[in-house]
Amino acid sequence: MIGLIFGDTDFPMEILKTIKKKKINYLIIDLSKSKKFKKDKKSYSVSIGQFGKIINILKKSNCKKVLFAGKVDKPNLSKLKLDIKGIYYIPRIIKASKLGDAAILKEIIKILAQNKIKTENSLIFNPELYLKKGNFSKIKPNKQDQLDITKAIKTLNSLREYNFSQGVVVRNQKVVSIEGKGGTKKMLEKSRSKKFRNHGVLVKFPKKKQDLRVDLPTIGLKTLKQSKTAGLKGIV
């Protein structure tokens, strides 16, 4: 039995397809905005602040392992629906929120671990979604591209440990934009250039100490199209 804690984006659907194909027993904790999994009989729609309900659902189903997938927006703590355990744990979440979005996820993992629930890597059932090191296009990066890539990696590594930014656009060794709360789409919109076409790179890169079980940098088809529209040469 695996507990699937799902948010938005298409990533959770890919995991669910594999889970069903392999006939693995599962349940879904649906944290998506639109409650996109409500038609699944094994799905439970809850608020992120209902820790008691979430933990009870998992324990009642003898579910000792979970994985996180999809985007879950940082909650408005003043409007959060809390149950008794939520009230108990909320001071820890508030404290973590001051460090950034990634810190909230890490704190939730700790809370689950204290309740003897282990968090698995989100790609445990879908290793094919993980790209290995290498060049997957016909275009090879030149010297300028390599300089841009190096600049981008240094920029991401210089950010705070709990900063949610996982992406940066660099063109001609200048940082054009860094991923903010608007996500990759907003960052790429800011990076559009009429002067430079086929110049610059988007680098999506995990920072040091980043917990890849719940905070995995992802790139989808939309990002590829948006990068082309922005006039970038490649993605790393």
Q: Language-model segments: which ranges?
A:
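Short glycine-/acidic-enriched loop or helix-start segments at secondary-structure transitions
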Residues: 14-15, 38, 77-79, 212
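Short beta-strand segments
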Residues: 5, 30, 68-70, 170-171, ...
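Short, well-ordered alpha-helical microsegments
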Residues: 12-13, 51, 75, 105, ...
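Feature captures the catalytic cores and cofactor-binding loops of soluble hydro-lyases/lyases
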Residues: 31-56, 60-63, 83-89, 93, ...
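N-terminal basic/disordered segments at the start of proteins
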Residues: 1-31
